[in-house]
From Swiss-Prot:
Gene name, Swiss-Prot/TrEMBL: erpA2
Residues holding iron-sulfur cluster: C53, C117, C119
Upper lineage: Bacteria, Pseudomonadati, Pseudomonadota, Betaproteobacteria, Burkholderiales
Protein name, as recorded: Putative iron-sulfur cluster insertion protein ErpA 2
Keywords, ordered alphabetically: Iron, Iron-sulfur, Metal-binding
Organism, as annotated: Polaromonas naphthalenivorans (strain CJ2)
MF-aspect GO terms: 2 iron, 2 sulfur cluster binding; 4 iron, 4 sulfur cluster binding; iron ion binding
Record's subunit section: Homodimer.
Gene3D superfamilies documented for this protein: HesB-like domain
């Protein structure tokens, strides 16, 4: 069962649960990585920056801090954090973890992306 819960979004108070999905497979992988890091306070931060071959790039980092205007999505007890600027580009997206022939990686299925590059790490809106 996939779950998404918006705990707090001061920057976009109208954001409803499910408008940004953090899948159980992504949460399970993040949980494994948190155990490896040995810091139970870590959260996966998703951010969008300018650059990449299509205009914007996705990035992920572990963070044990949250800002007042961050949006926090919790699935299976694991938190995904998105800053206010990045949130506008990923609303409606699904953050997933895929393990396949091309390797293991976090993937963002973003309906807002008008085009993406071949590797899937950059997009345009």
């Amino acid at each position: 069962m996939e779950a998404a819960l918006n705990i707090a979004s001061p920057s976009l108070p109208g954001v409803m649960p499910g408008q940004l999905e953090f899948t159980t497979s992504a949460a399970a992988k993040v949980s494994e990585l948190i155990v490896e890091e040995g810091n139970p306070n870590l959260k996966l931060r998703l951010y969008v920056t300018g650059g990449g071959c299509s205009g914007f790039s996705y990035g992920f980092a572990f963070d044990d801090q949250t800002a007042e205007d961050d949006t926090l999505i919790v699935t299976e007890g694991v938190a995904l954090v998105v800053d206010a600027m990045s949130l506008q580009y990923v609303l409606g997206a699904r953050v997933d973890f895929e393990d396949g022939l091309e390797g293991s990686r976090f993937v963002i299925h973003n309906p807002n992306a008008q085009s993406t590059c071949g590797c899937g790490s950059s997009f345009s809106v």
